[in-house]
């Protein structure tokens, strides 16, 4: 499998001109205009934790949702709005459309993709699956609609371990894609028989154990929070490992006052909102400035700006379309995930 196209697209994006920074007055004007458009168009704004703080705050202020990809999918599926504006990366918009084909789904830009999605082209992935027909195909949500349509299950990082444990209990060997680091983490946690694709997230793969150990020495009382898309050596240093929502919960419940966080720094908005008396520090990446590709912030998440959000509402640009022939096949593994997690919630409530 090749990652030439992935590397070229990453390099092209990082070399592109970045959006201008709005003044405080311009920012306020854009926020007010977006709120008015959302109301006028019966639309709701859904933002991922990795988006810039101003976008997350706007989603909250306008009655939308700020969450991980699982809750984004659930919220968009259950909300009555006829238009869903997804501030995130393209697979999130596609997921919203698959679950809500009758709704209009907009994104601030269709160029906001994901290195995991780029690194798992459907033709190569389908051939890989065909070579292992005895395996249950489980894919991470960070994949295209076409890859989801080839899968038996879709999972997010917040439910992956539980779903793989369920499949393991049924004696099912698993073919996993695309994130190799998350796949290995699930293997270690469950002992499942898993064959792994070799994709990786450009943000999380940059975290390095040696630099993290050095930072821990500077902050010996800090707890280390790590997303499982990070390399195994980084995960091994963690006090808590989990999805974005699980890391936020850990920040709330652990007694530490300082946290070193190995995930996208966009998550600090929600962590600081919920834990105003605690300090959060970015985990070190492989380099600094021009030496790192992401510097702990997804370059595609950063494309979700106020200007682009307003433009997509006013112009109807950035609309997500999914091949109607794919939707029935792609919705099946997504619904399995949503039904499984809903049943797990009910069981937890019953045991509370």
UniProtKB/Swiss-Prot annotation:
Its EC number is 2.5.1.72. It catalyses: iminosuccinate + dihydroxyacetone phosphate = quinolinate + phosphate + 2 H2O + H(+). GO terms for biological process: 'de novo' NAD biosynthetic process from L-aspartate. InterPro entries: NadA (IPR003473), NadA_sf (IPR036094), Quinolinate_synth_A_type1 (IPR023513). Keywords: 4Fe-4S, Cytoplasm, Iron, Iron-sulfur, Metal-binding, Pyridine nucleotide biosynthesis, Transferase. It comes from the Bacteria. Pathway: Cofactor biosynthesis; NAD(+) biosynthesis; quinolinate from iminoaspartate: step 1/1. It is found in: Cytoplasm. Its main location: cytoplasm. One of its GO terms (cellular component) is cytosol. Gene3D superfamilies: NadA-like. Binds 1 [4Fe-4S] cluster per subunit. One of its GO terms (molecular function) is 4 iron, 4 sulfur cluster binding. [4Fe-4S] cluster binds at residues 114, 201, 298. Iminosuccinate binds at residues 48, 69, 140-142, 157, 227-229, 244. Catalyzes the condensation of iminoaspartate with dihydroxyacetone phosphate to form quinolinate. HAMAP family: NadA_type1. PANTHER family: QUINOLINATE SYNTHASE, CHLOROPLASTIC (PTHR30573:SF0), QUINOLINATE SYNTHETASE A (PTHR30573). Belongs to the quinolinate synthase family. Type 1 subfamily. This is Quinolinate synthase. It comes from Pseudomonas aeruginosa (strain ATCC 15692 / DSM 22644 / CIP 104116 / JCM 14847 / LMG 12228 / 1C / PRS 101 / PAO1).
């Amino acid at each position: 499998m090749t990652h030439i196209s992935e590397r070229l697209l990453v390099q092209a994006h990082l070399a592109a001109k970045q959006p201008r920074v709005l003044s405080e007055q311009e920012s306020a004007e854009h926020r007010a205009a977006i709120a008015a458009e959302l109301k006028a168009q019966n639309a709701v704004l859904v933002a991922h934790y990795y988006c810039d703080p101003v976008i997350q705050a706007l989603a909250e202020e306008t009655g939308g949702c700020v969450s991980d990809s699982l809750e984004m999918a659930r919220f968009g599926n259950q909300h009555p709005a006829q238009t869903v504006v997804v501030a995130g990366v393209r697979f999130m918009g596609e997921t919203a459309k698959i679950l809500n084909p009758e709704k209009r789904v907009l994104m601030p830009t269709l160029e906001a993709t994901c290195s995991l999605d780029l690194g798992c082209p459907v033709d190569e992935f389908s051939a890989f699956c065909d070579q292992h027909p005895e395996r249950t195909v489980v894919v991470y949500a960070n994949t295209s609609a076409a890859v989801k349509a080839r899968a038996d299950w879709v999972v997010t990082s917040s439910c992956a371990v539980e779903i793989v444990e369920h499949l393991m209990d049924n004696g099912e060997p698993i073919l996993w894609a695309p994130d190799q680091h998350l796949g290995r983490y699930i293997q270690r946690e469950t002992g499942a028989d898993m064959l792994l694709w070799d994709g990786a997230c450009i943000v999380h793969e940059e975290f390095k154990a040696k630099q993290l150990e050095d930072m821990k020495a500077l902050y010996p009382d800090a707890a280390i929070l790590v997303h499982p898309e990070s390399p195994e050596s980084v995960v091994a240093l963690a006090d808590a490992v989990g999805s974005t929502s699980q890391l936020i919960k850990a920040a709330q419940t652990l007694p530490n006052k300082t946290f070193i966080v190995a995930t996208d720094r966009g998550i600090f908005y929600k962590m600081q909102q919920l834990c105003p008396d605690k300090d959060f520090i970015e985990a070190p990446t492989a380099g600094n400035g021009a030496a790192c590709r992401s510097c702990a912030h997804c370059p595609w998440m950063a494309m979700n700006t106020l200007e682009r959000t307003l433009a997509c509402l006013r112009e109807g640009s950035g609309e997500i379309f999914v091949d109607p022939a794919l939707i029935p096949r792609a919705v099946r593994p997504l619904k399995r995930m949503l039904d499984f997690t809903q049943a797990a919630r009910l069981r937890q409530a019953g045991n509370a």
